[in-house]
UniProtKB/Swiss-Prot annotation:
One GO MF term attached to the UniProt entry: indole-3-glycerol-phosphate synthase activity
Identification of the protein by name: Indole-3-glycerol phosphate synthase
UniProt-listed GO biological process terms: L-tryptophan biosynthetic process
EC number: 4.1.1.48
Organism: Pelodictyon phaeoclathratiforme (strain DSM 5477 / BU-1)
Organism superkingdom: Bacteria
Keyword hit for Membrane: no
Annotated pathway: Amino-acid biosynthesis; L-tryptophan biosynthesis; L-tryptophan from chorismate: step 4/5
The UniProt record lists the keyword Lyase: yes
Catalytic activity line of the entry: 1-(2-carboxyphenylamino)-1-deoxy-D-ribulose 5-phosphate + H(+) = (1S,2R)-1-C-(indol-3-yl)glycerol 3-phosphate + CO2 + H2O
Keywords: Amino-acid biosynthesis, Aromatic amino acid biosynthesis, Decarboxylase, Lyase, Tryptophan biosynthesis
InterPro entries: Aldolase_TIM, Indole-3-glycerol_P_synth, Indole-3-glycerol_P_synth_dom, Indole-3-GlycerolPSynthase_CS, RibuloseP-bd_barrel
Amino acid sequence: MSYLSRILEEKEREVGELASEHPARRYAELQGSLAPTRDFTGALRRTGRGLRLIAEIKKASPSRGLIVPDFDPVNIARRYGELGAAAYSVLTDRTFFQGSIDYLQMVSRSFQLPVLRKDFIIDESQIFQSRLTGADAILLIVAALDSCQLGDYLQLAASVGLHVLVEVHDRKELDRAIEKGAPIIGVNNRDLKDFSLKLETSLSLRPFIPSDVLAVSESGLKSSADIALIEQASFDAVLIGEGLYTSPELGRITWS
């Protein structure tokens, strides 16, 4: 069984638990009192000063295990803000990434930068939960959704004020994202089936992303040379997690 299949199987169980919290009903009751979401899409637009950084706050991963033993999401977010991050990505998957929706809430309440909820969204209840807990944007992974779900979830997210980053890994997934009107497309250099990495994935797919769609390169960026390649390919932003922890070189870059 692939990594993605295992994750989605577990996610089905989590969604069953979430149903008992009735997030759709809670959203209907509370929507009038919720603060407006911050402009995640606008934060990623290049202004001629280089790539924008989505800095990922991640405790662990299936491929590497525990990454940050003394994990403090607020302190990590503060450091990334000082580096010049344009937005945050917070892992909320519990089982495989040791994440928590509480981490998202902590970061969202503590800082003004927009926050992306990084998880495996497979049900409408997760979208309502995201809005209720302070996310400004969500990730939709094309490989985890059928075409109807992708279109429906894009519309639902927009209706509750959430921005959406749609993640793809190959040309077929990219075409599906474009067909459904994805406003931001993230090319994941990591294959979610086996978690292998190839930076070439971003470089090969970039020419097929329309000019009016924001393009993000995700995962596997480990050096200033990698960043230069992505910038030359005319991406708007990068999403970096482990690299900011493990590469002193990336930690010294001052992002625009």
